[in-house]
Design a protein with these regions (language model features):
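Conserved PLP-enzyme active-site core in the AAT-like
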Residues: 1-184
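Conserved PLP-dependent catalytic core of the aminotransferase class-I/II
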Residues: 15, 173-174, 178-238
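Long alpha-helical, hydrophobic tracts
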Residues: 21-23, 27, 299-307
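Structural alpha-beta junctions
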Residues: 90-97, 219-226, 307
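Short acidic (Asp/Glu) and glycine-rich catalytic loops that position anionic groups and cofactors
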Residues: 103-104, 153-159, 186-196, 243-248, ...
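A common structural junction motif
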Residues: 165-166, 268-275, 304-307
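Short, amphipathic alpha-helical "lid/cap" segments that border enzyme active or binding sites
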Residues: 174, 178, 295-299, 303
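Conserved C-terminal alpha-helix-loop-beta "cap" of PLP-dependent enzymes
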Residues: 208-293, 298
């Protein structure tokens, strides 16, 4: 919204039909473009868009080319999209900015951290994007915020837009974001200090061991009454990130007489709420989302909620 309003207000913004994404809260790219004061020009088809499609729609009133990275879904099969380097060359030729909404955003090489590959912000900037926006939470592991980086001249223009003052973060958000970014200084810091990366990297064997240890400490009557078992599971990153990837995990599975929906409400309404999910008509509490510092609290919550 801020990028488009600052760089292309009153002009046309070109975007591929296959990139008109919807994010959480039913916010859609076409609505954001309209709200920013721009007119959306869609090109290509849902599964295929070519460079010529973009070039054919560029006019004197074109304000920008927008690329929205589909971080919360993937189109597979008979598909084709334009390389960012080619779009960058076209945008430079026509003297219009190339704006990239990266969505979740990654600033580290995930494969070096033992995680699935995800293109980095740096790689998109090197490929020629004029400005790139991404989330401060999700894959980055920080506070909920939007981050914009790119060419200095365009960033200055965005910074001077009145919307910037209305949308700027508070000091607490900046402080948390700074602390999060400092964890990326070395690979060791990321794995030890960044909670998101720590949770991603906990192995299934480790989680199974933790789960069984907690179950042993529960009163036997609670375990029997609620049919609590520790089982292997697969989980997703969530927050619209890495949509095709599954992460091996382990969970408490409740297979007792109480209905899964009722059990879920019981946990959510507790003084210290515990959020789980329902799968195969059983309530699950997945250990992939439980930091090591909260394992004792989880045990206490299980006892107080179920006794």
């Amino acid at each position: 919204l801020l990028m488009l309003n600052a760089l292309a207000e009153g002009k046309e913004v070109i975007i591929s039909r296959g990139e008109q994404v919807e994010i959480g809260g039913s916010f859609r790219i076409p609505d954001v473009i309209k709200k920013s004061g721009c007119k959306m020009i869609e090109v290509g088809t849902t599964n295929k868009t070519h460079l010529q499609d973009y070039e054919n729609e560029i006019t004197p009133i074109t304000g920008a080319i927008l690329v929205a990275h589909t971080s919360n879904y993937k189109v597979m099969g008979f598909t084709e999209s334009v390389k960012l380097s080619e779009l960058s060359a076209l945008a430079k030729k026509k003297k219009i900015p190339l704006i990239l909404d990266l969505g979740s955003g990654a600033i580290a090489d995930f494969q070096k951290l033992g995680l699935p590959h995800e293109p980095t912000v740096q790689s998109y900037l090197k490929s020629g994007a004029s400005v790139v926006s991404f989330s401060g939470d999700k894959l980055l592991g920080g506070p909920q915020a939007g981050i914009i980086c790119g060419k200095k001249t365009l960033i200055r223009k965005i910074h001077k837009n009145p919307l910037y003052r209305a949308l700027r973060c508070d000091k607490f958000t900046y402080a948390i974001l700074e602390a999060t970014l400092r964890t990326y200084l070395t690979p060791i810091d990321i794995q030890k200090e960044n909670l998101t990366m720590t949770l991603f990297n906990r192995s299934q064997a480790e989680l199974l061991k933790i789960g069984k240890k907690i179950v042993k400490k529960l009163p036997r009557k609670i375990v029997d009454k609620f049919g609590i078992e520790v089982e292997q599971t697969e989980v997703e990153a969530g927050s619209g990130s890495l949509p095709l990837e599954k992460f091996p995990s382990a969970a408490f599975v409740f297979n007792g007489e109480m209905k899964a929906s009722e059990l879920g409400r019981k946990f959510r309404s507790a003084p210290n709420p515990v959020l789980g999910y329902i799968s195969d008509n059983c309530f699950h509490i997945d250990l992939k989302a439980i930091p090591a510092t909260q394992e004792k609290q989880l045990l206490s919550s299980l006892i107080s909620i179920l006794q």
